[in-house]
Swiss-Prot record:
Family from the record: Belongs to the FKBP-type PPIase family. Tig subfamily.
GO process annotations (BP): 'de novo' cotranslational protein folding; cell division; chaperone-mediated protein folding; protein transport; protein unfolding
Stated name of the protein: Trigger factor
UniProt xrefs under InterPro entries: PPIase_dom_sf (IPR046357), PPIase_FKBP_dom (IPR001179), Trig_fac (IPR005215), Trigger_fac_C (IPR008880), Trigger_fac_C_sf (IPR037041), Trigger_fac_ribosome-bd_bac (IPR008881), Trigger_fac_ribosome-bd_sf (IPR036611), Trigger_fact/SurA_dom_sf (IPR027304)
Gene designation per UniProt: tig
Molecular function via GO: peptidyl-prolyl cis-trans isomerase activity; protein folding chaperone; ribosome binding
Annotated source species: Paenarthrobacter aurescens (strain TC1)
Any one Pfam family match given in the protein's UniProt record, by short name: FKBP_C
Compartment(s): Cytoplasm
Amino acid sequence: MKSAVENLTATRVKLNVEVPFEELKPSIDAAYKTVASQIQVPGFRKGKVPSKLIDQRVGRGYVLETAINDGLNGWYQAAVQETGVRPLSRPEVEITEVPDPSATDGELKFQVEIDVRPEIELPDYAGIKVEVAAAESSEADVDKSLDELRGRFGTLKSVERPAKNDDFLTIDITATIDGEDIDSAAGLSYQVGAGTMLEGLDEAVTGLSADEEAIFETTLVGGDHAGESAQVKVVVKAVKERELPEANDDFAQLASEFDTLAELREDLAKQAADSKVVEQGVEARDKVLDKLVELVEVPVPDSVVEEQIEAHFNPENAHGEGDHDTEEHRAEVKANTERAFQNEIILDAIADKEEVDVSQNELIDYIVTTASQYGMDPNQFAQIIDQSGQVPMMVSEVRRRKALAVVLGQAEVVDSEGNKVDLTDFVRPAGEAAAEEAAAGEANEEADVVASDDPAAVKF
């Protein structure tokens, strides 16, 4: 078999494939067996019909067509391996020549057009310079954290006054189009200012007391009437405010392991400082990635964008957002898809150059972390991703993160005050940090999760 690559664009190629008759013959023999098992001829057992009789009954052309259809994917995959292209889209195949059915020689020729991963040229990424905000926490940050903690222990109390921002309401709503009620709901709980229901609702309920109502115009964002303008009547049934417990030593003992408010505030101050450092690292990471995308031109195949948009807005998809299918939303999905693709291509290229690999420990760390984000047991989550064939995808994700950490570790990062920012802890692999903790006797075992570099020790 011979194959050659013809570059059509930076992201699309045409494979020209030639399969000689001697390589086609095994598929023809297999096709005869397939056809023999499908037809019945008096005097012959099923599957034992001679080739010549099959030619008489269904024609050798049909057998040849079956052989080509059954073998095409294998020859395509062989051509991909031979040429080294990395397909991104479904192949578009055109058969340009087939052997004469009446002859015992000739060639099968076909062409395949596919989108492929683009080849890029990496710039010198060592010493990329970025500026981030200074990691400064304040008493205001501590007060905010303390108020959030108090809010978790707060209680709701009905009040006899007009509603204001942050109040909690019980409301009934009815949506009307052209005088016809098209939807309604009663007894809904809503926090003023949350902005999680209908546009215009916050303005409508602000200033209303219990048993008062308002009517406002809005554009519906879901259901059968998504995108249509509707008149909405909202009736406030109750207005409540959240009472926060007093911040004192008693509260500190209730809400934490500390005995005094001073100790609790000290701990919250440390958390705020640590959070600012993490925010600084995240900002540096994002800006370094922005710089990489600026430095490298990565063409994005149309098929990548089209498939993502189709999946995103497919109403049959559990995660589809058909109700929000607008030009603005499509443009947003397109931009996000293009950026994600560019990130992947650049980071994969850096990982190749830096010879980044992924250890079993690092993969398990990532699985455990991801499982916790979904609120799942790590072992159960690992089993699910293994059964769905997503382990290679996760390995690639860890590899890209490590590649970005390499670039970030070589970057020159300063804060807004000109101070050099040390990102050592931020870019250090989680497995390395865990190893240090274990050596110091501080590591906690992950329940029932094996962490080993021995692949046989991990059961997915």
